[in-house]
């Protein structure tokens, strides 16, 4: 059947709700009433393709209807003089140097990864790459921040085993990313049982483009031709955005059908083809066919340019020849790009597509006016006002701020810190990520200067940020870091988000760069609940306040709601991807100790608070009070560490696992031990000083020959000399009493193999 009419004008409220459920539209009663009223005004009943197109455009995933009000309120006007495009197209664009710009974006692929972990994660990588490519940029780096369930437990109330999800997600990222030739260089992995049924897969991509080759995601002029380039169109991914805009309840045939099928062997030539065409200057506009498929891509692109479109689906190459018109229109089949060219350039674009063995279809024409018409087999299946399609309802949802009591629960001190330390380094959230990251190719393209690990051969440790050299003839580099602190945000959404951003800044600064831009992926539960909406609003407010304070542009973002299962929400998880600039990549710093007899300094005021720390959580303490980070102190750290970089041999921020894990990881990268005394850090208990994770602290390794200059120049900051490097043991004392004395290798062995049983 090509199409059928739906008699919506005669439907009552119950009929409208039943129709929304029956067709998988995920529209509310009020939204269905608005659709009914539109067609009453038009004097006709809709065709099925029109109803599905509206549902796609009005989905939470595509329209941001629950978040747009607050995003505009708090994140507008966060541009800088070096911002080229922010919150306008498929990705953000920021100046790199006088001739080039870098392009960046982060997206979530959460619901698909919960139902089909391998495929969901793989298509998340493919989609984020196309978001960057459609701006005309060559992808140069992939990023993925993963939030997984409790893989250590065999008991779970979830759709799938958390361990199965974890292994599938990593496998999907590995197989897609490695096959398209883009290095996977940065990210994070965090574990908590709240993610058992709702894993979070936040994928990011960075690209590089000449400024005169930036492509917009909005139509250029009437008369241009719309083309479809890439893979074939099938039934995979139908209603994908509707599925991602609702609460996950069970795995069904419809939910599996909503998962897109990725094919990196098509993605790579598609990427090469459109970049080749862009280099020739024939692409006037371009948009990735991701969520919502052709329906969303075509509607959004022509509407953004102030035009309409006349489209025919007859030339589209199909996987299933019996597909109906509405299925073709909303299919979310992957590896497809909507391209706009001048009429005289159609044949040239076709030649390029055929050269790369890609499917090529002529869709139609950009026209004056605000109407979109779509035909299939000589039948008109869509004839609608684009403004109605693209202007989904915007909700100012009510919210309640969390009432945070200023109380802190203090866990008891370990009886034996040596035994405790050996167990602590092997915990899921402290252990090495080698088992995950070594599956990814992080050196392809030959531009990775500092990878996700750094250190001496066979003694690598975690990097704070990675460093990419995008251009062959320039030493200027990009620094990349990504992650979230849901353990903090769940206690205090505002201060916890500030802590997430503070850590990102310290990661960039520790590696030798200066923060330059921000993108986010905001993952929360059901926005129809006021407490969840309160988490979201406070988190977005924090991002706005922080970025204004530090003059950082927020250039792109993504919101993922409805991450709940059986009324259990995930921890609020605002993931931040931050990019920094370094003028000379040869000056980049790494995290591992470089030599014996170096002086170890702690920079920044101690937070002295265990709330949200891994130490507290392993003692089953999940509440508390989180002090706001001192942002003025952080600004001074950026200035001083950047200005006096030659004094610093290595640096590592204090975050997950506290001061203890920061020092241990610095030791793990070279095998060089250390001897420190906690007495000068603060007056708090030893466990608080060792395992507190909040605040702005950074550990610095200082060459003794520069120590005098260092202390003089850093006198405006809180700095404490806590010890020196040397030997092959980790020795921690306090006021002359020994607390920890262990071989570096013994601790490293536990840390390195912490994930072995799970992946």
UniProtKB/Swiss-Prot annotation:
Intracellular or extracellular location(s): Cytoplasm
Entry GO CC: cytoplasm
Residues that hold Mg(2+) 1 according to the record: 107, 558
Binding-site residues for ATP, renumbered to this chain: 64, 105, 520, 557
Record's keyword annotation contains Cytoplasm: yes
Principal subcellular localisation of the protein: cytoplasm
PANTHER family: PHOSPHORIBOSYLFORMYLGLYCINAMIDINE SYNTHASE SUBUNIT PURL (PTHR43555:SF1)
Protein name: Phosphoribosylformylglycinamidine synthase subunit PurL
Organism: Thermoplasma volcanium (strain ATCC 51530 / DSM 4299 / JCM 9571 / NBRC 15438 / GSS1)
Lineage, top ranks: Archaea, Methanobacteriati, Thermoplasmatota, Thermoplasmata, Thermoplasmatales
Underlying gene: purL
């Amino acid at each position: 059947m090509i199409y059928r009419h739906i008699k919506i004008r005669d439907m009552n409220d119950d009929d409208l709700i039943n129709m929304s459920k029956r067709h998988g539209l995920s529209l509310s009663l009020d939204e269905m009433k608005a659709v009914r009223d539109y067609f009453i005004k038009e004097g006709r009943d809709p065709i099925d393709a029109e109803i599905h197109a509206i549902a796609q455009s009005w989905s939470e995933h595509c329209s941001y209807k629950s978040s747009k009000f607050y995003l505009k309120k708090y994140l507008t006007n966060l541009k800088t003089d070096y911002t080229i495009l922010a919150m306008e197209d498929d990705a953000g664009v920021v100046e790199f140097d006088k001739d080039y710009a870098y392009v960046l974006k982060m997206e979530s692929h959460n619901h698909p990864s919960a139902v089909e972990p391998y495929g969901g994660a793989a298509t998340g990588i493919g989609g984020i790459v196309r978001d960057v490519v459609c701006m005309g940029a060559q992808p140069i780096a992939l990023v993925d921040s993963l939030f997984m369930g409790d893989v250590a437990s065999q008991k779970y109330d979830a759709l799938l085993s958390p361990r199965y999800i974890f292994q599938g997600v990593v496998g999907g990222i590995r197989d897609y990313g490695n096959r398209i030739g883009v290095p996977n260089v940065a990210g994070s992995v965090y574990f908590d049982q709240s993610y058992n049924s709702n894993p979070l897969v936040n994928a990011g991509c960075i690209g590089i483009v000449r400024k005169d080759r930036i492509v917009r995601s909005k139509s250029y002029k009437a008369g241009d031709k719309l083309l479809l380039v890439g893979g074939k169109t099938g039934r995979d991914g139908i209603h994908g955005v509707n599925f991602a805009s609702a609460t996950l309840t069970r795995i069904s045939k419809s939910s599996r059908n909503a998962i897109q099928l990725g094919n990196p062997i098509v993605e790579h030539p598609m990427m090469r083809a459109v970049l080749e065409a862009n280099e020739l200057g024939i692409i006037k506009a371009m948009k990735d066919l991701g969520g919502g498929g052709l329906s969303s891509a075509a509607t959004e692109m022509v509407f953004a340019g102030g035009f309409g479109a006349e489209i025919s689906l007859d030339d589209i190459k199909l996987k299933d020849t019996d597909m109906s018109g509405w299925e073709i229109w909303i299919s979310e089949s992957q590896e497809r790009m909507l391209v706009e060219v001048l009429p005289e350039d159609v044949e040239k674009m076709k030649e390029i597509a055929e050269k790369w063995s890609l499917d090529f279809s002529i869709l139609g024409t950009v026209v004056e006016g605000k109407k979109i018409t779509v035909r299939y087999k000589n039948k008109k299946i869509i004839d609608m006002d684009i403004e109605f399609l693209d202007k989904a309802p915007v909700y100012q949802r009510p919210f309640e701020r969390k009432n945070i009591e200023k109380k802190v629960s203090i866990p008891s001190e370990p009886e034996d810190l040596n035994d405790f330390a050996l167990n602590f380094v092997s915990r899921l959230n402290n252990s090495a990520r080698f088992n995950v990251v070594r599956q990814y190719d992080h050196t392809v393209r030959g531009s990775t200067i500092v990878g996700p690990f750094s250190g001496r051969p066979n003694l690598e440790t975690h990097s704070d940020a990675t460093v990419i050299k995008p251009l062959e003839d320039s030493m200027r580099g990009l620094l990349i870091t990504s992650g979230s602190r849901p353990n903090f945000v769940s206690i205090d959404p505002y201060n916890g988000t500030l802590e997430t951003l503070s850590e990102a800044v310290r990661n960039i600064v520790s590696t030798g760069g200066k923060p330059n831009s921000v993108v986010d992926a905001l993952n929360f539960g059901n926005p129809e609940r006021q407490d969840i909406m309160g988490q979201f609003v406070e988190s977005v407010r924090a991002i706005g306040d922080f970025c204004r304070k530090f003059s950082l542009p927020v250039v792109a973002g993504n919101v993922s709601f409805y991450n709940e299962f059986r009324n259990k929400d995930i921890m609020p998880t605002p993931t931040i991807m931050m990019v920094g600039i370094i003028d000379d990549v040869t000056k980049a710093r790494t995290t591992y100790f470089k030599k014996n007899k170096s002086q170890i300094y702690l920079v920044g005021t101690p937070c002295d608070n265990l709330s949200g720390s891994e130490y507290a959580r392993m003692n089953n303490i999940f509440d508390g009070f989180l002090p706001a980070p001192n942002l003025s102190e952080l600004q001074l750290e950026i200035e001083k560490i950047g200005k006096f970089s030659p004094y610093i041999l290595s640096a590592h921020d204090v975050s997950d696992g506290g001061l203890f894990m920061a020092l241990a990881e610095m030791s793990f990268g070279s095998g060089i031990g250390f001897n420190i005394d906690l007495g000068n850090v603060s007056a708090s208990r030893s466990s608080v000083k060792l395992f507190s994770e909040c605040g702005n602290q950074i550990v610095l390794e200082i060459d003794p020959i520069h120590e005098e200059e260092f202390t003089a120049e850093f006198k405006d900051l809180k700095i404490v000399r806590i010890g020196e490097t040397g030997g092959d043991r980790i020795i921690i004392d306090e006021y002359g009493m020994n607390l920890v004395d262990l071989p570096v290798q013994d601790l490293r062995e536990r840390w390195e193999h912490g994930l072995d049983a799970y992946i």
